[in-house]
Amino acid sequence: MEGALDTNRKNAIEIKGLGKKYESFNDGESQYVLRDINIDVMENEFVCVLGPSGCGKSTLLNLISGYIKPSDGEIDIFGEKVTKASGRAGMVFQEHALMPWLTVKKNIMMGPKLHHKSKEECEKIAKKYIDMVGLGGIEDYYPRQLSGGMAQRVGIARALANEPKIILMDEPLGALDAMTRENMRRELLNIFQKTQITIFFITHSVQEAVYLADRVIVLKNAAVDCDVKIEMDRPRDMKSPDFAKYIE
């Protein structure tokens, strides 16, 4: 699996002059949590966003999804301005947020049902993504019966079942133990390769970002501090000298 991108691909996400400010509870003055953000994400590109807590990573994701509105600038998804939450991008959170009264299969079928797919289509879509994330055999389990890694796989399958062109991920592996997290990274890259989807991934781990991404964007003091292209083929060895250069 190569890390090179086709430069003829169009932009999936265009962020232009983006700013978000909130009114301070203390003095009533507005304070920017994001300022003058300019980012282009290509179709079928895996981009990781890094930064300390409170730097605006999750706010940026919520702006791209349309859950909140910007104070300045705009965001386009495949050339269309984001004005509200529309379902054009799938979302995966640190907490899987599965419906506890629904089985794995029925959680995954929720999106297709909302898009008025037939029962047969919903079943077919659910099976496709259950198999893709390696959950065959547990489709009738309930969320309480799943490990953290399994539950997060269901969350990813549920997002994919809507068949979006973009997946937005807010530290989806952050709550997992080290071994499960390592396995999930490999699974995620496998899904990325199979689906040719665009992934915009928030993390606080430098190693994780370098392992996964085509590009790593670092946020600091409410702005883009740097944008680094990872010029390494996949799969990547975290112990290699080339990998260490990016960590330094």
List where the protein language model places each region.
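Conserved signature/switch motifs of ABC ATPase nucleotide-binding domains
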Residues: 141-144, 162
